[in-house]
């Protein structure tokens, strides 16, 4: 079962990465520039994938400085040397700024040190400066070799043998300031740190009715400031790419006082450290504080987050991203020829792609140039689709126009939560309500799912009613698993009574089934002939039509955090294996991705049937592992992966078979996976996807205006989801064919392609399908 079969032409040969296919190669891995959480996950993936394909992998300590100094700074890595680093922030191989490498003499020394170990493949994890340096090194390589030969430091054979240097980059930077990739390694973790601080500050600010000015990192890039402002519903944000208009001081003070007048007890202003005005003059946090104090007299505090943002444990997203990129980097090095340019492994949507390194660097420099020349619209455009989308969404949600400036549509749009609670649902409701009001609709909230709908628990909901909802976990509207099927008459009556013109459903598989039932009931009940759209929100991530659902990232972080703690407990005890049961129904997403993020030895899932022989081989594998220095094991099991191989059965089997070698413990994570404050990813995903759903509803209602049109076509009842690189609306009627209704999962799931990754990184042999990687793409500037 492969989610990407469609990409390989029918009848084409699938391409697999074979074990030991890189024998004889030597790869050097280094981290350079400012550190970022997740760099260790990338180093681990490069080392283990390199060893798996039979290459020698060398650590280059302290970045380019270590390459120039040589000696013990370049050391061969083995499997165990990258154990227990997945959950550690920063970089275990060190990073340093290096002046020597900027000179030709320095690069000559570096080339000599690499040649002594036969290293002609470099994997560089760092920012644009580090990657530019690597590219220059690659260009000069043949000249450096000739110079070394002239100096008698190497012989002519070596010049022939090591004629080419291959370079692959991964972007490790918390600022997300590199063009060509949606997310850089470390950005998501930095957002976690910022949001933890904002959530903590909110409670104290509310107690004292204070205004807080938070300064976040980003000298030349406002990504962290923008996304954290979106994730916490900040009152105002200052970015280098989009400076405030002339007279912003007065506008900001008006906005803050309006919010106070609406009984909001706190104001949050987020400032990127590189914030500027339209004349390129810096806007500092102190300047903003003075302004608020003198103009409004509010009790105002400044908090500068500083290096806290670089620290702490990497988030699940960063671990998975870095692991995928590390593996892709090794494949890119194996496939590199003298003609391929240095490339960067990056993320586009949900897809790992390779881009020419210098194209990305050039575009990144173009952004800075545009800002220097005060071409701010160009700067936003060059930052890419994701940045521009975030900025647009923030503006729509933060600033409410006066009522007399909003054209009224006389349409009522209802929002409902269905299924089990998922973190991020409230962010989605807030976004829908505010976008709907800004579009001129009257917004209605339906409480307690379809059950509440049938009973008429429906109330109008206003702009300020949803203030502060973004960071709240669970479902404030209330949610139930009840399907509408048995209440169709009552729901139709409520639709008529409240004259509901469109419906937005936020929920999991029950929401999807409910949408199908409402669709089927259109013939009988004309009340259901209105635009309906569903936004997937469930920890299980099992809704057809979308690669991701709201809540899954928060659950994944909960699982990963718990696994980290459990691994620590196992390390202290020595020779202990933990069996952990995750949620997800029949969908193995949480078990599989949790396994990848936590560094598990195995993950049992329903989608990949297993038998007693597989369990036996896992036990043998763990028995071998206990002979090494890593004397602990971690096994994840999806709650419904097998009727008979239950968590208890697997625990008992492992306990018996491991007697005398290791002991075993089990842990069922349960409902803690549904709770907690939403992660930054879920807050923003919920906010953005829900805003898109409302835009679709508005467009549909516009089509029908004045004609009292009934919506009966399939394309008026859709699921909105992310698929590969696009946000798409898919009619539920079409999704039926793609659904396994018995097990409540889509028939094809993209993440199954990452199954072999987890196995390879846990020292199993597995064939990894690389059919759709390897094409070098080009950076496309995005047009606003």
Curated annotation (Swiss-Prot):
User: Catalytic activity, per the record?
Assistant: beta-D-fructose 6-phosphate + ATP = beta-D-fructose 1,6-bisphosphate + ADP + H(+)
Whichever gene encodes this chain, its name is: PFKP
- The UniProt record gives the binding positions of substrate as 173-175, 210, 217-219, 273, 301, 307-310
Record organism: Homo sapiens
UniProt KW keywords: Acetylation, Allosteric enzyme, ATP-binding, Cytoplasm, Glycolysis, Glycoprotein, Kinase, Magnesium, Metal-binding, Nucleotide-binding, Phosphoprotein, Transferase
N-acetylmethionine PTM sites in chain numbering? 1
Q: Name one Pfam family in it.
A: PFK
Record lineage? Eukaryota, Metazoa, Chordata, Craniata, Vertebrata
Protein name in the entry:
ATP-dependent 6-phosphofructokinase, platelet type
- State the EC number(s): 2.7.1.11
Residue ranges for the region (Interdomain linker) are 400-411
């Amino acid at each position: 079962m492969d989610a990407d079969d469609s990409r390989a032409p029918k009848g084409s040969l699938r391409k697999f990465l074979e074990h030991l296919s890189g024998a004889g190669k030597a790869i050097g891995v280094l981290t350079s520039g400012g550190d970022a959480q997740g760099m260790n996950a990338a180093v681990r993936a490069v080392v283990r994938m390199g060893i798996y394909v039979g290459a020698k992998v060398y650590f280059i300590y302290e970045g380019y400085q270590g390459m120039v100094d040589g000696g013990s700074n370049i050391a061969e890595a083995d499997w165990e040397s990258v154990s227990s680093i997945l959950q550690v922030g920063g970089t275990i191989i060190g990073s340093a700024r290096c002046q020597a490498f900027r000179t030709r003499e320095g690069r000559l020394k570096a080339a000599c040190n690499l040649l002594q170990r036969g290293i002609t493949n470099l994997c560089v994890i760092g920012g644009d400066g580090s990657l530019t340096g690597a590219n220059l090194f690659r260009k000069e390589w043949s000249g450096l070799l000739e110079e070394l030969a002239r100096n008698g430091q190497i012989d002519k054979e070596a010049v022939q043998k090591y004629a080419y240097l291959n370079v692959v980059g991964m972007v490790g930077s918390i600022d997300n300031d590199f063009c060509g990739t949606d997310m850089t390694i470390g950005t998501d973790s930095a957002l976690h740190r910022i949001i933890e601080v904002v959530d903590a500050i909110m409670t104290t600010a509310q107690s004292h009715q204070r205004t807080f000015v938070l300064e976040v990192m980003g000298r030349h890039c406002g990504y962290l400031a923008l996304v954290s402002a979106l994730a916490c519903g900040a009152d105002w944000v200052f970015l280098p790419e989009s400076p405030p208009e002339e007279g912003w001081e007065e506008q900001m003070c008006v906005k803050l006082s309006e919010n106070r007048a609406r009984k909001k007890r706190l104001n949050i202003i987020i400032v990127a450290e590189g914030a500027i005005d339209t004349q390129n003059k810096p806007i500092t946090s102190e300047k903003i504080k003075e302004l608020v104090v003198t103009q409004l007299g509010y009790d105002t505090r400044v908090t500068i987050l500083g290096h806290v943002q670089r620290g702490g444990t990497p988030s699940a997203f960063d671990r998975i991203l870095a692991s995928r990129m590390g593996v892709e980097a090794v494949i890119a090095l194996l496939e590199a020829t003298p003609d391929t340019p240095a490339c960067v492994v990056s993320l586009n949507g949900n897809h790992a792609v390779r881009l020419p390194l210098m194209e990305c660097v050039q575009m990144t420099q173009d952004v800075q140039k545009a800002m220097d020349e005060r071409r701010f619209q160009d700067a936003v455009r060059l930052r890419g689709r994701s940045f521009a989308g975030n900025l647009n969404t923030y503006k729509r949600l933060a600033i409410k126009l006066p009522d007399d400036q909003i054209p009224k549509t006389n349409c009522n749009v209802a929002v409902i939560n269905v299924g089990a609670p998922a973190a991020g649902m409230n962010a989605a409701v807030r976004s829908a309500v505010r976008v709907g009001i800004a579009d001129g609709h009257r917004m209605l909230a339906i409480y307690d799912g379809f059950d509440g709908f049938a009973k008429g628990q429906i109330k109008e909901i206003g702009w300020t009613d949803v203030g502060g909802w973004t960071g709240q976990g669970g479902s404030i509207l209330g949610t139930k698993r009840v399907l509408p099927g048995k209440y169709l008459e009552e729901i139709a009556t409520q639709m008529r009574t409240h004259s509901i013109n469109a419906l937005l459903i936020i929920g999991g598989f029950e929401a999807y089934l409910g949408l199908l039932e409402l669709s089927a009931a259109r013939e009988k009940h004309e009340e259901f002939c209105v635009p309906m759209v569903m936004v997937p929100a469930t920890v299980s991530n099992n809704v057809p039509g979308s690669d991701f659902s709201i809540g899954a990232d928060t659950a994944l972080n909960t699982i990963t955090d718990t696994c980290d703690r459990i691994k620590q407990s196992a390390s202290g005890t020595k020779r202990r294996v933990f069996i952990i049961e995750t949620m997800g129904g029949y969908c193995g997403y949480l078990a599989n991705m949790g396994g990848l993020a936590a560094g598990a030895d195995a993950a049992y899932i329903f989608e990949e049937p297993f038998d007693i022989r597989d369990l036996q081989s896992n036990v043998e594998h763990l028995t071998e592992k206990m002979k090494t220095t890593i004397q602990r094991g971690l096994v994840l099991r999806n709650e419904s992966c097998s009727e008979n191989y239950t968590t208890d059965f697997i625990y008992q089997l492992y306990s018996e078979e491991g007697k005398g070698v290791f002991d075993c413990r089990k842990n069922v994570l349960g409902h803690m996976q549904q709770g907690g404050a939403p992660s930054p990813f879920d807050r923003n995903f919920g906010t953005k996807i829900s805003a898109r759903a409302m835009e679709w509803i508005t467009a549909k209602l516009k089509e029908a205006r004045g004609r009292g049109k009934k919506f009966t076509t399939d394309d008026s009842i859709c699921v909105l989801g992310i698929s590969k690189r696009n946000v798409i609306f898919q009619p539920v009627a079409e999704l039926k064919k793609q659904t396994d209704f018995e097990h409540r999962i889509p028939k094809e799931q993209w993440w199954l392609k990452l199954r072999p990754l987890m196995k390879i990184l846990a020292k199993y042999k597995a064939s990894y399908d690389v059919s759709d990687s390897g094409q070098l793409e080009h950076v496309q500037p995005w047009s606003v």
